[in-house]
Amino acid sequence: MDNPGFAGRKLGVLLTNGADAETLAALRAATAAEGATVEIIAPAVGGVDVSDGTRVRADQQLDGAPSVLYDAVAILAEPGGARALAARPAGRDFVTDAVAHCKFIGYTSAAAVLFEAAGLPTDPSSADDGFISLSEHPAAEFIARCGQLRYWHREFATAG
């Protein structure tokens, strides 16, 4: 499939307290290297504290930042944060809308509880190549895949 690239595009990163700081840094670097931007979405407008104690300012609050605003999304959560997202309609909708719009979705393993609450498999990458585990694959690989802009196979798989 053609790969127009991710330059000029926007990655929405849904971030919770305790999310892995190294994964966030790698995503930011890989996105910048492709000429794209990152927008941080947090459960509250004040931002979050990531795993190394750094306070990360939110560009958007979850309730006002649906995944439709982004070309691709990533979910960086720790278990407690993922459970909190799963309990919120906006958290579940963020995921289900991204799936419905055939977006590439990067995630860390703690997001499994959010996927389950949204009615998805807890390991969605086993059935859908549009999901990329950032716990298993480098951020640069995820961003390169995002250059395809959409994972259209998902739409074809659900149409039949």
Ranges and model annotations:
Residues 1-100, 113-160:
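Extended, subdomain-level signal for the structured scaffold at the beginning of enzyme domains
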Residues 101-108:
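ADP-ribose/adenylate-binding Rossmann-like module
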